[in-house]
Amino acid sequence: MDDMAENAGISARKLLFLPYLMGERTPHLDPNARGAFIGLSAIHERGDMIRAIMEGVSYSLADCLSVLDEMGVRPEKMLACGGGGTSALWRQMLADIYGMSVSTVDSKEAPALGVAILAMVGAGIYSTVQEACEKILRLKTTTAPIAENSEKYAKVYAIYKALYPHLKNDFGALAEL
């Protein structure tokens, strides 16, 4: 699937996906929000739809990151694991959209390792999460953002961000049917 999505290129030939399949919680807090393809036409193929879904989920996560930005917290790097973390294309997409490096951890059970790290901090084995991560985590791959891609994604993300406010009332009306 990565090959098909990669061939579609950034913006999936002008196709956007809103990933609100079960409403939206952050930052919109709207249980009526629904998923949608915007810009779908007869020219689009499976790869375009896959790419649009990947980008839509990435933009949704960028919305979550914007909440941290508003609180004055800006991560400098990201760790990816599991499903999307195994995709080199998705890691590059995340790095480009967020403007930060995305690394994978050399662990097949990274989520469980994260829980173990939190437990060790809670038990006093390490004094901070940062200290525990520095001692325990081993990075496997690191993907740096590509400035040219970041510029392209920023233009698409601006359109993505404008869609929810335009559709909010329609989502509500649809829920009332």
Annotate the PLM regions.
Residues 1-177:
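Glycine/Thr-rich phosphate-binding loops that ligate phosphate moieties of nucleotide
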